[in-house]
Swiss-Prot record:
It comes from Murine polyomavirus (strain A3). It holds the Pfam family Polyoma_coat2. Residues 306-319 are annotated as: DNA-binding. Keywords: Capsid protein, DNA-binding, Host endoplasmic reticulum, Host membrane, Host nucleus, Late protein, Lipoprotein, Membrane, Myristate, Transmembrane, Transmembrane helix, Viral penetration into host nucleus, Virion, Virus entry into host cell. The lineage of its organism: Viruses, Monodnaviria, Shotokuvirae, Cossaviricota, Papovaviricetes. This is Minor capsid protein VP2. One of its GO terms (biological process) is viral penetration into host nucleus. Belongs to the polyomaviruses capsid protein VP2 family.
């Protein structure tokens, strides 16, 4: 409302100032007659080709601001009058409808739900006043009732997953320990077997030559025994028994051993010595020690040097 009054005051002051400058009356400006007269003069001057619209306004002594005010005021007045008429119409219709409603309104006392039972209102915090903490306890029971099933399901699933994971870890650890234990047992048995085995150093080519020589000698001895058989065929049984007794007696008295009883060795047998002093400790020759320690997982300094020399060389880090 204050803004509308301010606009009206500014409009009145502008009308008075424009009327003084141009000599036009306020009624002519508000009705639009002044604008029509100015447009007619400007059109006449521009059609003759003498000057433009701005020059015509300057010739008549009217500035562009004054001409804009004269052309805007009639439009503003018409719109304001229409708005006021619409507001009066709406206000009149509202007054008429209000009077009709008051005339048709029934002011009797309603009888709907007159016999309905009424429940007295009680403050929800009344129980908490009489029994402090009962509302919190009821809320906790409600939470447990609503969330109990889901909570038990989640906890049970978590416990089951923990049991499965722990069982899997325990089984993996037991299997790993059993595998390591069996491997150590096997390697320990293999090491003890190598320690107690009879070792022989042999030369394979020389052994083959010796075997061929023994075969040739056995063939020649077969032919010689056949000739001896035919040569000794004339001996009678008593003579043969006497000869056998004489040969057996010579063997029992440390005599020469027949060639058939001589066992040829395929190589040089390595002699193992026990621990001195009867300590009953495990003894291993020096040449077998790296093998035994390797089976037990230990590496001697000599082997470490060999592995470091023969293994891949580490690349030098570039600076």
């Amino acid at each position: 409302m204050g803004a509308a009054l301010t606009i009206l005051v500014d409009l009145i002051e502008g009308l008075a100032e424009v009327s003084t400058l141009t000599g036009l009356s306020a009624e002519a400006i508000l009705s639009g007659e002044a604008l029509a007269a100015l447009d007619g003069e400007i059109t006449a001057l521009t059609l003759e080709g003498v000057m433009s619209s701005e020059t015509a306004l300057a010739t008549m002594g009217i500035s562009e601001e004054v001409y804009g005010f004269v052309s805007t005021v009639p439009v503003f007045v018409n719109r304001t009058a229409g708005a006021i008429w619409l507001m009066q119409t709406v206000q009149g219709a509202s007054t008429i409808s209000l009077g009709i409603q008051r005339y048709l309104h029934n002011e009797e006392v309603p009888t709907v739900n007159r016999n309905m039972a009424l429940i007295p209102w009680r403050d929800p915090a009344l129980l908490d006043i009489y029994f402090p903490g009962v509302n919190q306890f009821a809320h906790a029971l409600n939470v447990v009732h609503d969330w109990g099933h889901g909570l038990l399901h989640s906890v049970g699933r978590y416990v089951w997953q923990m049991v499965v994971q722990e069982t899997q870890h325990r089984l993996e650890g037991a299997v790993r320990e059993l595998t390591v234990r069996q491997t150590h047992t096997f390697l320990d048995g293999l090491a003890r077997l190598l320690e107690n085995t009879r070792w022989v150093v042999s030369n394979a080519p020389q052994s083959a030559i010796d075997a061929i020589n023994r075969g040739a000698s056995s063939v020649s001895s077969g032919y010689s025994s056949l000739s001896d058989y035919y040569r000794q065929l004339g001996l009678n049984p008593p003579q043969r028994r006497a000869l056998f007794n004489r040969i057996e007696g010579s063997m029992g008295n440390g005599g020469p051993t027949p060639a058939a009883h001589i066992q040829d060795e395929s190589g040089e047998v390595i002699k193992f010595y026990q621990a001195p002093g009867g300590a009953h400790q495990r003894v291993t020759p020096d040449w077998m020690l790296p093998l035994i320690l390797g089976l037990y997982g230990d590496i001697t300094p000599t082997w470490a040097t060999v592995i470091e020399e023969d293994g891949p060389q580490k690349k030098k880090r570039r600076l």
